[in-house]
Amino acid sequence: MDLTVKTLEGKDAGKVSLSDAIFGLEPREDIIARVVRWQLAKRQQGTHKAKGRAEVSRTGAKMYKQKGTGRARHHSARAPQFRGGGKAHGPVVRSHAHDLPKKVRALGLRHALSAKLKAEEIIIVDDLVANEAKTKALAGAFASLGLTNALIIGGAEIEGNFKLAAQNIPNVDVLPVQGINVYDILRRGKLVLSKAAVEALEERFK
């Protein structure tokens, strides 16, 4: 499929052909959802913790004698049923990450790219270069392209002025092509790819 290449000023700069093997798949929500779940589980800190009965600071002495009171038999006040006792089966520090085959992760990225193209939410720009590190000028350029909520993917490295100018614009994320991922593609409205990013993706998946 051919798409028109734009400049940051909104002018036409030729056309680029996109590979159907990357951008022309019929999007499968189940594969995309698996990759998103994998990403979000992997980034969870897992620092949640509640003290169990062995960890709470409370006396371990028997509460009262075993027989003769008419009350239920109890021992330690650290037991979970008592106020101030330990939590039964509480959260512990752990990793939430789970495995996902590399082929499924790669397939999920291709389906996410295909979904964006099908929704007509991909814009190709010739180059991501700013003459000066001024947010106002770049924000104006984005407005001319209709970019109010976007993920922008550049080549292997993002040009310095462009990176500085873009980092303060709300709802706009800028990543090098090696940082492209399913979750960030889906959480933003438009996907902006530089020609260098398109070439790198086609090289990666060929």
Swiss-Prot record:
InterPro entries: Ribosomal_uL4, Ribosomal_uL4-like, Ribosomal_uL4_dom_sf. The keyword Nucleotidyltransferase does not apply. GO terms for cellular component: ribonucleoprotein complex; ribosome. Keywords: Ribonucleoprotein, Ribosomal protein, RNA-binding, rRNA-binding. Residues 63-93 are annotated as: Disordered. Residues 64-77 have a biased composition (Basic residues). GO terms for biological process: translation. Gene3D superfamilies: 3.40.1370.10. It holds the Pfam family Ribosomal_L4. Transmembrane segments: none annotated. One of the primary rRNA binding proteins, this protein initially binds near the 5'-end of the 23S rRNA. It is important during the early stages of 50S assembly. It makes multiple contacts with different domains of the 23S rRNA in the assembled 50S subunit and ribosome. Forms part of the polypeptide exit tunnel. Part of the 50S ribosomal subunit. Belongs to the universal ribosomal protein uL4 family. PANTHER family: 50S RIBOSOMAL PROTEIN L4, LARGE RIBOSOMAL SUBUNIT PROTEIN UL4M. This is Large ribosomal subunit protein uL4. The gene is rplD.
